[in-house]
């Protein structure tokens, strides 16, 4: 196990050790955009286990790349996906339901793939850089008047 640099890392490493999870978790360190894309595409499921979020870019990125997604019900997550349609959403304070949802993704790969396709299509609309730039430009133009 790597040397933990702070209390949170020590906590994470303790959990990994206690649950015999070393070898199942990868700490990547900093990644450039291409490396991040490669990691996303190697993933069988993307999990956003946040307790606080606004509009999580990482969720949008995973959806755009067609990775099945599970996210905690915080911030703007419900604006990015609908539970059971583009992915799964669970209460942020329910780790047991998160574990269940992860197992469901693996137990039903056809359903996971269907949600991933729907997520990719939806994110293609909500995360279209050119469209979002035009909308922002229009908003700022209106404000400036």
Name these PLM-found stretches.
Residues 9-30:
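Nucleotide-activated donor-binding/catalytic signature segment of Leloir-type glycosyltransferases, i.e.
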Residues 30, 38-43:
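Short alpha-helical donor nucleotide-sugar binding micro-motif in glycosyltransferases
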Residues 37, 56-64, 78-79, 85:
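Short alpha-helical segment that forms part of, or immediately flanks, the ligand-binding pocket
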Residues 46-47:
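A short hydrophobic beta-strand element within the catalytic core of glycosyltransferases
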Residues 51:
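Aromatic "clamp/platform" in nucleotide-sugar-dependent glycosyltransferases that forms part
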Residues 68-71, 81:
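Short hydrophobic beta-strand element within catalytic cores of glycosyltransferases
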Residues 83-84, 88-95, 104-109:
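Conserved acidic donor-binding segment of nucleotide-sugar-dependent glycosyltransferases
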Residues 97, 104, 111-126, 132-138:
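A short, well-ordered alpha-helix in the C-terminal region of glycosyltransferases
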């Amino acid at each position: 196990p790597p040397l933990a640099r702070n209390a949170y890392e020590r906590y994470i490493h303790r959990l990994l050790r206690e649950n015999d999870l070393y070898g199942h978790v990868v700490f990547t360190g900093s990644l450039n955009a291409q490396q991040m894309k490669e990691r996303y595409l190697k993933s069988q499921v993307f999990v956003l286990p946040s307790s606080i979020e606004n509009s999580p870019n990482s969720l949008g990125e995973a959806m755009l790349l067609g990775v099945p997604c599970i996210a905690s019900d915080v911030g703007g997550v419900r604006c990015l996906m609908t539970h059971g349609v583009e992915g799964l959403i669970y209460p942020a304070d329910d780790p047991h339901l998160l574990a269940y949802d992860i197992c469901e993704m693996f137990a039903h790969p056809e359903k996971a793939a269907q949600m991933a396709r729907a997520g990719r299509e939806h994110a293609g609309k909500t995360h279209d850089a050119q469209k979002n730039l035009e909308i922002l430009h229009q908003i700022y133009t209106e404000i400036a008047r």
